[in-house]
């Protein structure tokens, strides 16, 4: 159900949500601010080019698995844009049709935009590749750390992003180490990621994540 709140805010109310809401993207459209609104201080806007006159492709926007109702906020004056008719609820997302020129040999995410590799480590007989990643389009934005693993550096398993854009800002480049001697106190063999969070509001902040 769509609820208009003034000229520039639309609330999407979803009952018994599926795994995803598939958002239609138009490359030439201006960005809208889209947020999963659960009333938490950690709720974060994502900049997404929602389709206005045509759909170039869809991207999945993850919904919480255990919620009975969900609200997604869209901050932008979109009027009767095409996106409202083309949004879809789904438990699956098949990216196989999104890129006819997808590389076969070189690593590439299943969908979205990627840039430089970050935090390359080897742990428990697996190579971990983290990289600059925007899961909501094919242009720069919404910086996450994408995450893939491999045993031979040729065949890759794509995992959920390791670090997602948050209220501190975009997740910019950094490095990772495997703390084999528990020097930092987060556990023997913990992976420590050091990176820069960046936003207009907060500037650049040096951050640490671990797992």
Model-derived regions: residue spans:
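Beta-rich carbohydrate-recognition and catalytic domains
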Residues: 1-211
């Amino acid at each position: 159900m769509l609820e208009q709140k003034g000229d520039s805010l639309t609330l999407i109310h979803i009952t018994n949500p599926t795994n995803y809401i598939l958002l239609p993207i138009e490359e030439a459209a201006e960005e809208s601010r889209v947020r999963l609104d659960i009333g938490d201080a950690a709720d974060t806007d994502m900049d997404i080019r929602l389709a206005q006159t045509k759909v170039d492709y869809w991207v999945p926007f993850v919904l919480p698995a255990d919620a009975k109702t969900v609200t997604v906020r869209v901050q932008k004056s979109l009027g009767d844009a095409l996106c409202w008719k083309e949004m879809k609820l789904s438990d699956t997302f098949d990216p196989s049709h999104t890129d006819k020129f997808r590389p076969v040999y070189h690593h590439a995410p299943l969908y979205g935009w990627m840039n430089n590799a970050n935090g390359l480590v080897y742990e428990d007989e697996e190579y971990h590749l983290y990289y600059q990643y925007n899961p909501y389009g094919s242009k720069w934005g919404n910086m996450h750390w994408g995450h893939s693993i491999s045993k031979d550096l040729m065949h890759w398993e794509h995992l959920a992003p390791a670090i997602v854009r948050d209220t501190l800002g975009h997740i910019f480049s950094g490095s990772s180490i495997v703390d084999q001697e528990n020097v930092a106190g987060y556990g023997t063999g913990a992976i420590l990621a050091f990176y820069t969070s960046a936003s207009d509001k907060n500037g650049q902040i040096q951050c640490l994540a671990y797992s």
